[in-house]
Amino acid sequence: MPSKTTSSTNVREELIKRSLDETVAQYMTLCFDPKHRFSSPVQTFNTLLLIASQHVINVSPDSKKMIEEIVNNAQNAQNYDELRGYIEELCAKMYPYIFRLNVKVNTISVKFKSLPPSTANEVLLGVASEIIRQLYSTAVFDENIEVVTEKFVKLRDITLKLLRSIQNTTLYQYMKSIGLDENYVMKPCESELPVQCFLEIQSRLLEVVEFIATHMNARF
């Protein structure tokens, strides 16, 4: 039976996870759902600023300066169209910081499923963790298209190798049955816009690798 201290720690971690999860979901809704993004630009901008003040501004001096610059420019917006432009800019600048929260969310999640992995698993988990780290650290909005393309091609190839390395496991068979396999990784982009295409690839790779990491009890 878990001790009172262990129970309270688990409850606290679950509350933190839920809070971070909701923040990421709110950011995604405000920035990528046109219905929410354009219906009330002032409210959208203010809510994004609130999220930024909690999770972005204190990350580094550069992030604080970046947000302050957008806010100062937005205060001079003449109409909603201009304000929407600053919303787009704010969403883009916040993107790398917000998705680092997902790392925290997943780190907390896997603590509830921890079993001691074998040595072989540890090697695979090391690879998975590095793929995840690089995916989250790639700022698709800010970097040169050729650079991002090269990064994603490499990460996709490593992900395919990771999948092949677990082909003889029940985990792989289950992933294949739900469509998280090589075909999913290699699926062409639905969007012709480079940034949107990068986001699709990033999302698919993360879905596959995080599934492997979580079910192999990774600690990343």
Curated annotation (Swiss-Prot):
It comes from the Viruses. This is Uncharacterized protein ORF220.
